[in-house]
Amino acid sequence: MKQTLNIAVAALAVCLAGPASLLRAADVPAEGSTAPEFKLQSQEGKTVDLKDFRGQWVVLYFYPKDMTQGCTIEAHNFQRDLAQYQAKKAAILGVSADTTDSHQQFCTKESLTFKLLADPDKNVINAYGSLSPRGPVAARNTFLIDPKGVIRKVYVGVKPDPHSAEVLAALAELEK
C-alpha cells in the first residue's frame, strides 16, 4: 500500500511539473562549456567528427525517431531554413538512436539534405544529457555550438514547429 502511494505521488509530481522536468538539468552540458566530442555515422555511412566543424557554427539537434510526426516537422523546418544557416556558416546535425538505414530512408522520403547521425548505442545522446525518460530514444534537445566548440545556447524539450526560427534568431543575436 505504501509503495503504491509513493508511486502515485511520484507520478502526480511528474505530471504537474511537465515533461521538461523529466530531464535532469545537471546531465545537460551547460552554456559556456566545451561541447562533448563525438564521431558518428551519417545517413551515407560516413564518419562525422564534431572536430571537423571547428571554424563554423553547429546546430546539434537530438530528436526521438525518424519518420514520426514531430520529428518530421522539425526536420522539414531545418531543411526549409538551411540556406539561412549556411549563409551564417552554420551546419545542422540531427542525432537520434535510429540506424543509418533508417536515416537514409527518412532523408530520401522527406528530401532532407543535411546530415542525420546514428547513435544506436546512445553514447552521444547520453553525453549531451538527451536520453528521454520515456523510453530508449533521444529527447528533443538542441545545442548551438560556436566555431570554437563552445556550447552557446541550450534548448531542452523543444516544440518542433517554431524551433528552427528560434535557433536562427539566437544565432543572429550571438553573431553580433
List the predicted regions and their residue ranges.
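N-proximal helix/coil linker or "cap" segments that precede and/or mark the start of modular domains
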Residues: 4-37
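A short beta-strand-turn-helix
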Residues: 29-32, 38-57
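Short active-site neighborhood of thiol/selenol oxidoreductases, capturing the structured segment around
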Residues: 51-72
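Structural microenvironment flanking redox-active thiols in thiol-disulfide oxidoreductases
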Residues: 67-112, 121-124
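Structural micro-motif
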Residues: 112-114, 132-143
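Thiol-/selenol-based redox modules, centered on thioredoxin-like
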Residues: 138-176
